[in-house]
Amino acid sequence: MPQNRKLGRDSAHRNLMLRNLVTSLFKSGRIQTTEPKAKETRRAAEKMITLAKRGDLHARRQALAYMTEETVVTNLFEEIAPKYQDRNGGYTRIMKLGPRQGDAAEVCILELV
């Protein structure tokens, strides 16, 4: 059974952080974050796109329960999901940028393909 990375936070903080990162990804199309956060965000974002590809009311309500903005859910179901209708997974890409200046954390860009 796959486990989540802890990311140095308790479970409530981690879950809300991932929800916010997924919402930001669908709002802007790309986000810049650290590599472990990007890998966890990718897992959640790909699940949301697969859910949106179903397109039924139950899937929409599940997405609304996960994401923090209703307009982003509408965008996901009406614009993003139809674009990936014929693709089975692999909706996102991680591009590494190298270490961050302040703390040398590996930074990368997570974007929709």
Curated annotation (Swiss-Prot):
One of its GO terms (cellular component) is cytosolic large ribosomal subunit. Keywords: Ribonucleoprotein, Ribosomal protein. GO terms for molecular function: structural constituent of ribosome. It holds the Pfam family Ribosomal_L17. GO terms for biological process: translation. Part of the 50S ribosomal subunit. Contacts protein L32. Belongs to the bacterial ribosomal protein bL17 family. This is Large ribosomal subunit protein bL17. It comes from Alkaliphilus metalliredigens (strain QYMF).
